[in-house]
């Protein structure tokens, strides 16, 4: 049972109480102080000090100072008045226990409020930090977008300058051709004048030298007329024999029928043009060419302007939807923009158009399988992705990059991927 301490001293003013409590040689580390507005307890085993205060105090602003084996309390009163005693008198044990329990509940509620306030402050700090990070990321994203836009504008200007240069060069060549044609026409006129002058000179000379030789004069004049008027061109026909296409394939592995079918499909794809598009009337002549649009999309892809590249491929596909490379290149753009389902659709369409499988389209089919497999893996459909990678390896078994990626996918599926 602890020993009650009674040899304390206290003083007061209208606003504060100063309490001095001796520690009796007990180490400061073993001292526990508990204070509320109506209750003060100091536990330093084997001693105990307990005071049921005469009036409420401001326990948040009150202070305790330890020094010289003594604790000095400065207790600020809530109401400015002089106390008759430090602790209330005539209090029974039940009242004391009730005051203790009430003080403990108040302390617990304050601790809970302080914890909630601290958590709220922490959430506010995290929210503020998140908003700052989002703002920084937004600025970085805007900076990157501005850089991309500047690069796109630069590429567009360069393309327009190149087209203007080509137009001027074509005009210059046209002017040169017209000038050469005019010069040739002038030369022909001069030659005709010279021939006419020579014929007149010969006629006059023949009259003067041989006035009686009518027959000889007629012979020379007829010969001169024949020389001055060119004979009409003879009609002829030219027969052209094309060299047959020979594929470098062994006879036992020959795919002549498939290769001929593939060449036939390519020829049909080049002829398949859809000109019934309303926007075509606003386009230049070269912009109506799917090959030119494909090259333009490739240049935009190289400058990381993927949306503009997709627009170029879209128009090219509207003009000619039989070219597999348009779908294959658009799938690469969708992969960069994380449009994974569209990348899968375009890769599948490219594989449909790359039939029958021959050596000439092997590289394109391998790329289509890899891009579709990559999209499947990013959608966490690893089994489907591995199937595409294995199909790509069947086409090109010596591709080391595809081999490494396929092995990684197998490890993910088996749940044994090595930690890097």
Swiss-Prot record:
Keyword line: Cell projection, Cytoplasm, Neurogenesis, Nucleus, Repeat, TPR repeat
Record bears the keyword Cytoplasm: yes
Single biological process term from Gene Ontology: epithelial cilium movement involved in extracellular fluid movement
Domain CS: 3-87
InterPro entries in the cross-refs: CS_dom, CS_DYX1C1, Dynein_assembly_factor_4, HSP20-like_chaperone, TPR-like_helical_dom_sf, TPR_rpt
Compartments in which it is found: Nucleus; Cytoplasm; Cell projection, Neuron projection; Dynein axonemal particle
GO cellular component terms, semicolon-separated: cytoplasm; dynein axonemal particle; extracellular region; neuron projection; nucleus
Gene3D superfamilies: 2.60.40.790, Tetratricopeptide repeat domain
PROSITE patterns associated with the record: CS, TPR, TPR_REGION
A Pfam family per the record: CS
Residue ranges of the region described as Mediates interaction with ESR1 and STUB1: 7-103
Reported function: Involved in neuronal migration during development of the cerebral neocortex. May regulate the stability and proteasomal degradation of the estrogen receptors that play an important role in neuronal differentiation, survival and plasticity. Axonemal dynein assembly factor required for ciliary motility.
The protein's name: Dynein axonemal assembly factor 4
Protein's organism: Pongo pygmaeus
Name of the gene this protein is made from: DNAAF4
């Amino acid at each position: 049972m602890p020993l009650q301490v009674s040899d304390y001293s206290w003083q007061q003013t209208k606003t504060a109480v100063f309490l001095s409590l001796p520690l009796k040689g007990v180490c400061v580390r073993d001292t526990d102080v508990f204070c509320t507005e109506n209750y003060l307890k100091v536990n330093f085993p084997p001693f105990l000090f307990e005071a049921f205060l005469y009036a409420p105090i401001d326990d948040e602003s009150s202070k305790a100072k330890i020094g010289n084996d003594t604790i000095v309390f400065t207790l600020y009163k809530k109401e400015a008045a002089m106390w008759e005693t430090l602790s209330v008198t005539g209090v029974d044990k039940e009242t004391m226990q009730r005051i203790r329990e009430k003080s403990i509940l108040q302390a617990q509620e304050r601790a809970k409020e302080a914890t909630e306030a601290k958590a709220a402050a922490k959430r506010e700090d995290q929210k503020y930090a998140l908003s700052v990070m989002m703002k920084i990321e937004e600025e970085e994203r805007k900076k990157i977008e501005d850089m991309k836009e500047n690069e796109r504008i630069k590429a567009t200007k360069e393309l327009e300058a190149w087209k203007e240069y080509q137009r001027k060069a074509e005009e210059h060549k046209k002017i040169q051709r017209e000038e050469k044609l005019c010069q040739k026409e002038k030369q022909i006129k001069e030659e005709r004048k010279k021939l006419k002058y020579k014929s007149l000179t010969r006629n006059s000379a023949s009259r003067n030298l041989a006035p009686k030789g009518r027959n000889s004069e007629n012979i020379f004049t007829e010969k001169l007329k024949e020389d001055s008027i060119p004979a009409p061109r003879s009609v002829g026909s030219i027969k052209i024999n094309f060299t047959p296409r020979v594929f470098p394939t062994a006879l036992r592995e020959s795919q002549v029928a498939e290769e001929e079918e593939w060449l036939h499909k390519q020829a049909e794809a080049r002829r398949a043009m859809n000109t019934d598009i309303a926007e075509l009337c606003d386009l230049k002549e070269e912009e109506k060419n799917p090959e030119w649009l494909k090259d333009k999309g490739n240049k935009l892809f190289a400058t990381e302007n993927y949306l503009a590249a997709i627009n170029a491929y879209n128009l090219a596909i509207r003009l000619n939807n039989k070219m597999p490379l348009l779908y294959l290149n658009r799938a690469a753009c969708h992969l960069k923009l994380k449009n994974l389902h569209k990348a899968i659709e375009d890769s599948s369409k490219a594989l449909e158009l790359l039939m029958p499988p021959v050596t000439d389209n092997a590289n394109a089919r391998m790329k289509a399988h890899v891009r579709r497999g990559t999209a499947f893996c990013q959608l966490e459909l690893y089994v489907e992705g591995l199937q595409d990678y294995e199909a790509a390896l069947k086409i090109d078994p010596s591709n080391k990059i595809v081999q490494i990626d396929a092995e990684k996918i197998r490890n993910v599926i088996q749940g044994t991927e090595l930690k890097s």
